[in-house]
Amino acid sequence: MFDFRPFYQQIATSTLSAWLETLPLQLKQWEKQTHGDYIKWSKIIDFLPHLTADHIDLKSAVKAETKTPLSSGERQRIIHHLKQLMPWRKGPYHLYGIHIDCEWRSDFKWERVLPHLAPLQNRLVLDVGCGSGYHMWRMVGEGAKMVVGIDPTELFLCQFEAVRKLLNNDRRANLIPLGIEEMQPLAAFDTVFSMGVLYHRKSPLDHLTQLKNQLVKDGELVLETLVVEGDINTTLVPTDRYAKMKNVYFIPSVLALINWLEKCGFHNIRCVDVETTGLEEQRKTDWLENESLIDFLNPQDHSKTIEGYPAPKRAVILANK
């Protein structure tokens, strides 16, 4: 089990202090609902060594090194523990000579998003659906004052805490295992990221409103999601699965997505990137035993999913509250 009290202390004197009215009780309830694997996963973090990195790079990667390299045996023990937390989906991480080669090259997405962002220096940042926290560390690397990630998945919390322990227990990033719908409206974050979440929502406009409720006035929303070609009235609603995912509900065109954001009261809305997901960005690795993108596409025509829908294409939209 993880101790969230250091986070409570961090936010007690910040603009997030109002969150303390609800958060401690919510996390106590969350702990009561965790399943047996969570206990096993959380104990793995205890088995990881207490290492002090002499060099940490969060600006160009998520990387930690010591002046004296670890022995082969030490590296193998760490790899053994980290592989018990598979699958590792978002990365990569480079920790003491260990390359955690995750399913997603999330650094590709970060390179696409970063040039368009309002500078993160000294900003309070929220990352919704943060997974194991790869992008959170990159946000810290850009100078964010504090990054809060929310994701209810127990495995992601354990992966995040494992990486944090190997990054000198850096407290500038914190993962809270809740969903956005469980957060009270704080209107406290300078930048809010929602990347790879919107299409999993049965009510996408509610999700956009929830994101808006966490932003300060004129704060920046960074929205990355699946899109399809089409006009302002085009939205794909898969009948069953999309790319073998059963929880995909709405995939709009870029113009439809901009219309949704306008309807929710955002302004200064602009699409800064559209990219088809490539096989070099999402693929099988030794850190993932599951299927990956190649298995989700039509083997005869990679421009379509295995169900016959357009292959995954992702847009990055920026907007202000």
Curated annotation (Swiss-Prot):
Enzyme class: transferase
GO molecular function annotation: methyltransferase activity; transferase activity, transferring alkyl or aryl (other than methyl) groups
Gene Ontology biological process terms from the UniProt entry: tRNA wobble uridine modification
Keywords, alphabetical: Transferase, tRNA processing
Reaction(s) the record says it catalyses: carboxy-S-adenosyl-L-methionine + 5-hydroxyuridine(34) in tRNA = 5-carboxymethoxyuridine(34) in tRNA + S-adenosyl-L-homocysteine + H(+)
Keyword field contains Transferase: yes
Presence of the UniProt keyword tRNA processing in the record: yes
InterPro entries xref list: CmoB, Mo5U34_MeTrfas-like, SAM-dependent_MTases_sf
E.C. numbers: 2.5.1.-
Highest taxon above the source species: Bacteria
Pfam family, one: Methyltransf_9
UniProt binding sites for carboxy-S-adenosyl-L-methionine: 90, 104, 109, 129, 151-153, 180-181, 195, 199, 314
Family according to the record: Belongs to the class I-like SAM-binding methyltransferase superfamily. CmoB family.
Quaternary organization: Homotetramer.
Matching PANTHER family: METHYLTRANSFERASE, TRNA U34 CARBOXYMETHYLTRANSFERASE
Role description: Catalyzes carboxymethyl transfer from carboxy-S-adenosyl-L-methionine (Cx-SAM) to 5-hydroxyuridine (ho5U) to form 5-carboxymethoxyuridine (cmo5U) at position 34 in tRNAs.
Protein name stated in the entry: tRNA U34 carboxymethyltransferase
Organism of derivation: Histophilus somni (strain 129Pt)
